């Protein structure tokens, strides 16, 4: 709940990208509810669909619809095949850069 309270004071506009990196943190569903009511451009939660699913269910019970819930990206990052923390961070950063430029991301044709 603390994260949700703090997010209320953050100016979130249509260029804001928010990434939740701890899918086990208390209050994630409440924080996501705050963000989904905003015009944030990108909302991501690190973790598998299995980990994030309970938050989606909780948000649905709070009245959020499919269109709202589709804004939540999870798992995060591009599929670069990496497993180390550095590689995962790179894949998330690359995904955010691709989003910045409205690109699907992939190899450039030669």
Which positions does each model-derived feature cover?
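Short acidic, glycine/proline-enriched helix-loop-strand junctions
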Residues: 14, 57, 61-72
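Short, well-ordered coil/turn residues at beta-beta hairpins
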Residues: 20-22
